[in-house]
């Protein structure tokens, strides 16, 4: 497909819309945008690195705006005062052997989830080859439906925050990423909600965590496949980044309860569509 000026403009608009959904709900950018670009006649070798690059930049911008508008509180300065008295804090203290742990809770969450996502992204190369695609998609779809129902069922309950549950969902998201290459965003978002994180905070944390994972995926793609079509990557990046202030503002205005319900519905819908795709294939 020839990338004319009108086409490039239309692609930028698509990226704006898809990233608005993603940075508002914590999921949907690659899931929606990649099939649309392929339907336009673009080759997968053009689309995949361009989407990863644009989502990396948009994730950074989204994290900045979510922090700026108060949806999250990121402080990535080194935490030098971590108490180890509580069992959950011991889990965090063990991460201290890495030489760095950020200060604020939201920054710690991004650190853990981003690290798990990186492990999963690298493991994807080795795990996905031996498992049938229908099995992978059926597993992811079923899990998302179950998590969506759980989030919906607990929407009126005040869940206490649990580092143990967060670690569990972090490693589960890494496993899913390694298994199928997908399911990271919705699982990380729903896992945070079920770990006692507020919905606004969960979206902001997911947005920045995905940026880290996309950067690793982009660099791995460059190392194994070669170059990037910047005529596609740049308009995608511009459109996606431009949507992030509006997304953060929307999250701020929606409030916790409405946003949690929207997240549950989005996770359920994504899981149902995935299962329907498996059933019809």
Where in this protein do the model-derived segments appear?
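Core segments of transmembrane alpha-helices
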Residues: 117-120, 210-215
């Amino acid at each position: 497909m020839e990338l004319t000026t009108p086409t490039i403009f239309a692609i930028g608009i698509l990226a704006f819309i898809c990233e608005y959904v993603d940075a508002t709900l914590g999921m949907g950018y690659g899931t929606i945008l990649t099939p649309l670009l392929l339907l336009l006649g673009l080759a997968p070798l053009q689309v995949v690195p361009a989407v990863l690059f644009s989502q990396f930049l948009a994730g950074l911008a989204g994290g900045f705006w979510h922090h700026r508008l108060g949806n999250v509180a990121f402080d990535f300065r080194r935490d030098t005062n971590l108490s180890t008295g509580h069992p959950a804090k011991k889990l965090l203290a063990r991460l201290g052997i890495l030489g760095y742990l950020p200060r604020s809770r939201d920054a710690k969450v991004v650190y853990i989830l981003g690290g798990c996502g990186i492990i999963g992204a690298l493991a994807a190369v080795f795990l996905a080859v031996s498992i049938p695609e229908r099995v992978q998609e059926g597993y992811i779809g079923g899990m998302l439906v179950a998590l969506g129902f759980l989030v919906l069922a607990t929407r009126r309950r005040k869940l206490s925050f649990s580092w143990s549950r967060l670690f569990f969902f972090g490693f589960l998201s890494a496993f899913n990423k390694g298994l199928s290459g997908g399911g990271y965003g919705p699982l990380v978002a729903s896992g945070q909600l079920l770990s006692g994180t507020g919905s606004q905070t969960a979206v902001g944390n997911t947005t920045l965590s995905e940026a880290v994972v996309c950067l690793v995926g982009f660099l791995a793609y460059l190392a194994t496949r070669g170059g990037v079509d910047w005529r596609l990557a740049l308009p995608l990046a511009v459109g996606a980044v431009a949507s992030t202030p509006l997304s953060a503002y929307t999250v701020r205005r929606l409030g916790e309860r409405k946003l949690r319900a929207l997240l549950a519905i989005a996770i359920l819908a994504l899981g149902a569509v995935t299962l329907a795709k498996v059933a019809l294939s």
